[in-house]
């Protein structure tokens, strides 16, 4: 047996022989000699390992060339390739949150393709500020005196706290000490900002007198945090921003209001739960308001800071600001997204996030009925497909108690022993993956976010029958 194994190893062609095989021509043309050589070496290493493990024959040059090419093709697929988000979570943190509007995509591409006046004043010919591209827009849409932005909302909170309360005290209700995604907690961010946390009230009830008692000569800021990713219900009490602003004004201490997801419009007009708007927070007297760009606003990831001019100027003087600034590509997309809000009557048509959230149940249910026959053919006979009414959610910590009527396709095994995890894995392995959620003994594909029916059916039809067996 040992001699036979050695013989099979000797039968393996050399790297050069594989590269000279006709089957390698297309690979060399497509991927180049260096990458092809490395792939052939890897294919030969796999073949040697297989022979050592008992494989009965040595693959020839053509087989090895095809194996090398297949590995290069697999490597060429981007890990961030497009997929179908059928999880029912519109703003899925792990799937990139907001899908950008076409106007934002076009603006970003233009900024990538050519030089742009990022920090250049076209009127004076002198150096400008990158914030100028969105400052006036943010002030117009929020009613604030001034505005700036950084690369995400956690950075906005960090920067503001460091500016207002480094080495000083920051007063916040215990019920607002939130934890956001990735186990990042507000107390940790405050500590990194150099602020000393002063908790007031209790988890479920905080009163104005709690803040008043906590005020001291060391107070740098009063912080209000909108608990956008959870709700405390029942025997509760909290102090509104307007009351806190009045108290802060009396004490000559700034009020900072972190809205988290943030929204520029009244969402109730689209059938969603009402959230406090940024304009309302500004009007209530918050000195600084922070909010996200890639959640309810429907744009790229960003952290917006709006409020009193003197406070914004202080934020902009903080050296930390430069480390957190946004690049030209994102800034171009942000500007284009914000401009869409100037026309609220057509916003749902142009902003994908809002369009998907406001999509009527009847439309989604009709789509499910259209897709069901072809979907059933793609997974039969191992699985069966049925129409299923379900509930979608906003996601990314926004409107945690607000679910939306939706419809989808639920795929269940015809044989109870078949694995739903295996089916989910097969869908993830597609060239354009399909991501659903497992519930109620099946894999549910919530169709709220499906806009490309033909592409979905094409991906589904590419399922490997062996993977489903």
Swiss-Prot record:
Catalytically driven reaction(s): L-seryl-tRNA(Sec) + selenophosphate + H(+) = L-selenocysteinyl-tRNA(Sec) + phosphate
EC id: 2.9.1.1
Gene3D superfamilies documented for this protein: 3.90.1150.180, Type I PLP-dependent aspartate aminotransferase-like (Major domain)
GO biological process: conversion of seryl-tRNAsec to selenocys-tRNAsec; selenocysteine incorporation
Pathway: Aminoacyl-tRNA biosynthesis; selenocysteinyl-tRNA(Sec) biosynthesis; selenocysteinyl-tRNA(Sec) from L-seryl-tRNA(Sec) (bacterial route): step 1/1
Residues that bear N6-(pyridoxal phosphate)lysine: 295
Keyword terms of this UniProt record: Cytoplasm, Protein biosynthesis, Pyridoxal phosphate, Selenium, Transferase
Compartments in which it is found: Cytoplasm
Single annotated GO MF: L-seryl-tRNA(Sec) selenium transferase activity
InterPro entries: PyrdxlP-dep_Trfase, PyrdxlP-dep_Trfase_major, SelA-like, SelA_trans, SelA_trans_N_dom
Cofactor(s) this protein cannot do without: pyridoxal 5'-phosphate
SUPFAM superfamilies assigned to the protein according to its UniProt record, in alphabetical order: PLP-dependent transferases (SSF53383)
Cellular component aspect of the GO annotation: cytoplasm
Assigned protein family: Belongs to the SelA family.
Function: Converts seryl-tRNA(Sec) to selenocysteinyl-tRNA(Sec) required for selenoprotein biosynthesis.
Database matches in NCBIfam families: selA (TIGR00474)
PANTHER family in the record: L-SERYL-TRNA(SEC) SELENIUM TRANSFERASE (PTHR32328:SF0)
Protein name (record): L-seryl-tRNA(Sec) selenium transferase
Organism: Methylocella silvestris (strain DSM 15510 / CIP 108128 / LMG 27833 / NCIMB 13906 / BL2)
């Amino acid at each position: 047996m040992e001699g036979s194994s050695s013989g099979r190893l000797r039968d393996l062609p050399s790297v050069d022989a594989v590269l000279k095989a006709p089957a390698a021509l297309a690979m060399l043309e497509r991927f180049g000699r260096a990458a092809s050589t490395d792939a052939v070496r890897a294919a030969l290493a796999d073949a040697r390992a297989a022979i050592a493990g008992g494989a009965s024959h040595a693959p020839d040059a053509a087989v090895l060339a095809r194996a090398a090419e297949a590995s290069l093709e697999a490597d060429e697929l981007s890990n961030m390739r497009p997929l179908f988000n059928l999880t029912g979570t519109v703003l899925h943190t792990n799937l990139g949150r907001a899908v950008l509007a076409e106007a934002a995509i076009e603006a970003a591409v233009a900024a990538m393709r050519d030089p742009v006046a990022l920090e250049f004043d076209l009127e004076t010919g002198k150096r400008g500020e990158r914030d100028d591209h969105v400052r006036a827009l943010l002030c117009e849409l929020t009613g604030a005196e001034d505005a700036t932005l950084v690369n995400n909302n956690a950075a906005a909170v960090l920067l503001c706290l460091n500016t207002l309360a480094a080495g000083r005290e920051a007063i916040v209700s215990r019920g607002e000490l939130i934890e956001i995604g990735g186990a990042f907690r507000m107390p940790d961010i405050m500590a990194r900002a150099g602020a000393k946390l002063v908790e007031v009230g209790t988890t479920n009830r905080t009163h104005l007198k709690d803040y008043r008692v906590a005020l001291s000569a060391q107070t740098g800021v009063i912080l209000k945090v909108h608990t956008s990713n959870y709700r405390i219900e029942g025997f509760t009490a909290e102090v509104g921003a307007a009351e806190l602003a009045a108290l802060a004004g009396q004490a000559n201490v700034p009020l900072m209001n972190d809205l988290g997801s943030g929204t520029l419009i009244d969402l109730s007009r689209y059938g969603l739960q009402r959230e406090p708007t940024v304009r309302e927070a500004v009007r209530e007297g918050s000195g600084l308001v922070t909010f996200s760009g890639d959640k309810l606003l429907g744009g790229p990831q960003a952290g917006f800071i709006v409020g009193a001019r003197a406070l914004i100027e202080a934020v902009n003087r903080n050296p930390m600001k430069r480390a957190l600034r946004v690049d030209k590509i994102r800034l171009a997309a942000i500007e284009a997204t914000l401009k869409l809000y100037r026309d609220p009557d057509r916003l749902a048509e142009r902003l994908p996030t809002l369009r998907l959230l406001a999509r009527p149940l009847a439309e989604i249910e009709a789509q499910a009925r259209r897709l069901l026959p072809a979907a059933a053919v793609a997974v039969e006979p191992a699985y069966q497909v049925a129409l299923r009414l379900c509930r979608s959610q906003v996601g990314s910590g926004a409107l945690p108690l607000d679910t939306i009527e939706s419809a989808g396709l639920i795929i269940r095994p015809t044989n109870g022993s078949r694995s739903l995890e295996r089916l989910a894995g097969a869908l993830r392995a597609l060239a354009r993956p399909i991501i659903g959620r497992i519930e109620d003994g099946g894999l549910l594909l919530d169709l709220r976010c499906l806009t490309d029916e033909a592409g979905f059916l094409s991906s589904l039809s590419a399922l490997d029958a062996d993977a489903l067996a």
